Amino acid sequence: MKHELSSMKAFVILAESSSFNNAAKLLNITQPALTRRIKKMEEDLHVQLFERTTRKVTLTKAGKRLLPEARELIKKFDETLFNIRDMNAYHRGMVTLACIPTAVFYFLPLAIGKFNELYPNIKVRILEQGTNNCMESVLCNESDFGINMNNVTNSSIDFTPLVNEPFVLACRRDHPLAKKQLVEWQELVGYKMIGVRSSSGNRLLIEQQLADKPWKLDWFYEVRHLSTSLGLVEAGLGISALPGLAMPHAPYSSIIGIPLVEPVIRRTLGIIRRKDAVLSPAAERFFALLINLWTDDKDNLWTNIVERQRHALQEIG
C-alpha cells in the first residue's frame, strides 16, 4: 500500500475535526484539494473511510480501524525525522503549554531552562490560565498539553498526577494567628478572608471540603489571582488560604505561611492531555522532561516550604 504521508495526515486531521472546512484550514489547503486527497486515498484502499453529511463527516468502520494506525505511523515518522535532526542539533518548532499560575511560579522556569539546554532551537509558549480555561485550551488543541488541578475533569482528558499539596494560611507576621504551628480552618472564622473568585478551582475545592461545617468563612475581598491576594495580605487587609506552591520562595518581610488542618485540604496538580492527542516529538520530550524533573524534585518541595515556615516562626519568636 503506497500512500503519501500528506494524505495520511489529512485523513487524521479530518477525522479529528469532523469537518472538511476546518480540516482544510488546519492543513492550509483548499477544501477541494482536501476532498481530492481523501477521495484518492479511498480509491487506493478500495474502501470508504468517511460518511459524509451536510453538517459533518464521521468515520466508517474501516476509517475507525485505520485511525489509530495512521496516528502511530505519523508519530513514528515525525520521531524519526526528529532523531535524525537531533544528531546535528537543528531542531525547530514550538511547544505550547497551558498552565495554572502557581505551577508556573514554582518549577516551570527550571524545566524550560533544562529543555532549552537540550533543544536550544525549540521555542516554548506558556499560556498562563485559570483551571477551566487551561482545560479548554487543551481540549481545543490550542496547547499541546497543560498543568492543571484534577478537580476539573473531562472524559476526553488524561491526567498524570505530579504533586498533592496542602493549603496554608497566609497572614502577616504580626497577626494573632502567626505564632501558631498549625491553624484549624474554624479559627479563620471572624477574620476578613481574601480569596480568589468563587468560580476558581481553588475556591471551589475549599468550599466543597468545608460545606458540611456549621460555620462559614467571611470571603470579604475577592481577587482574580493568588499573587494579588498576597499583596492584600501584606497590606494588612486580611488573611488568605492558599496552596503551598503559591507562597513566595523568598520570604516576604511581613508574610508567613502556616499549615491549615481540621481538615487538611489538598489539591492535586498534574499534566493534562487529550486522550486522542498525538504529541509532536518536541512536545513528547518536554512532557517527559516535566515528569522527570518533578519526580526528582518533589521531595524538596515540602522541605522548602516547611523550612521557610520554621525560619519565619523563629524570627517571630
Swiss-Prot record:
Keywords in alphabetical order, please.
DNA-binding, Transcription, Transcription regulation
Domain spans labelled HTH lysR-type: 1-60
Record's GO cellular component terms? cytosol
Question: Which GO terms are recorded in the biological process aspect for this UniProt protein?
Answer: regulation of DNA-templated transcription
Coiled-coil features, chain-numbered ranges: none
The record's GO molecular-function terms, alphabetically, read:
DNA-binding transcription factor activity; sequence-specific DNA binding
The domain of life is: Bacteria
DNA-binding region, as residue ranges, is located at 20-40
Q: Has the keyword Protein biosynthesis been applied to this entry?
A: no
Q: Which Pfam families match?
A: HTH_1 (PF00126), LysR_substrate (PF03466)
Name the family.
Belongs to the LysR transcriptional regulatory family.
Q: What name does UniProt use for this protein?
A: Uncharacterized HTH-type transcriptional regulator YbhD
Q: What is the lineage of its organism?
A: Bacteria, Pseudomonadati, Pseudomonadota, Gammaproteobacteria, Enterobacterales
